Amino acid sequence: MIIEKILGNLHELPASEAGAFAGLHQEKVVLPSAQLVKRIQRVTTDHGKELGIRLPAGSGDLRDGDILHVAETNMIVISVLPTDVLVVAPRSIHEMGVVAHSLGNRHLQAQFFDAGSEYAADVMVCQYDHTVEDYLKHVGVPYERQERVMPVPFRHAEHSH
């Protein structure tokens, strides 16, 4: 089976549509975050079914909860594996700027969340890297290492001087 479009996302369905999917069995395509940026790939569900994903150019990244296929009693959805991340909680705008500058010099991508997010605080999140953890310990910036399903995949940052 070739998947050429995303039918919706389980986490964003309006209440009026959510009921239609409530009784369906969820077959999952479990992917690491790095695979979410590929619009053409071959995947296998947790039931051993092989699928091809071929999304049109300009399609957004795959996300946790994306619905790939719906049949009578079954649906196939994307399930994203947690990513090993550092959740950095700077105490001031100065501390945030210094840490963000250091991460930028290392070409690491960061995602930013505010107090209204699932983190319930103003934080920046980057993929785990032992040198970043050592740096944060050295400068005394509060952080926590966590396993998280990120809403947006981290992308490799191309760079040249």
Curated annotation (Swiss-Prot):
<dbReference type="InterPro" id="IPR007864">
    <property type="entry name" value="UreE_C_dom"/>
</dbReference>
<keyword id="KW-0143">Chaperone</keyword>
<dbReference type="GO" id="GO:0051082">
    <property type="term" value="F:unfolded protein binding"/>
</dbReference>
<dbReference type="InterPro" id="IPR036118">
    <property type="entry name" value="UreE_N_sf"/>
</dbReference>
<dbReference type="InterPro" id="IPR004029">
    <property type="entry name" value="UreE_N"/>
</dbReference>
<dbReference type="InterPro" id="IPR012406">
    <property type="entry name" value="UreE"/>
</dbReference>
<comment type="function">
    <text>Involved in urease metallocenter assembly. Binds nickel. Probably functions as a nickel donor during metallocenter assembly.</text>
</comment>
<comment type="similarity">
    <text>Belongs to the UreE family.</text>
</comment>
<dbReference type="Pfam" id="PF02814">
    <property type="entry name" value="UreE_N"/>
</dbReference>
<keyword id="KW-0996">Nickel insertion</keyword>
<dbReference type="GO" id="GO:0019627">
    <property type="term" value="P:urea metabolic process"/>
</dbReference>
<dbReference type="Pfam" id="PF05194">
    <property type="entry name" value="UreE_C"/>
</dbReference>
<keyword id="KW-0533">Nickel</keyword>
<dbReference type="GO" id="GO:0065003">
    <property type="term" value="P:protein-containing complex assembly"/>
</dbReference>
<keyword id="KW-0963">Cytoplasm</keyword>
<dbReference type="GO" id="GO:0016151">
    <property type="term" value="F:nickel cation binding"/>
</dbReference>
<dbReference type="GO" id="GO:0006457">
    <property type="term" value="P:protein folding"/>
</dbReference>
<dbReference type="GO" id="GO:0005737">
    <property type="term" value="C:cytoplasm"/>
</dbReference>
<protein>
    <recommendedName>
        <fullName>Urease accessory protein UreE</fullName>
    </recommendedName>
</protein>
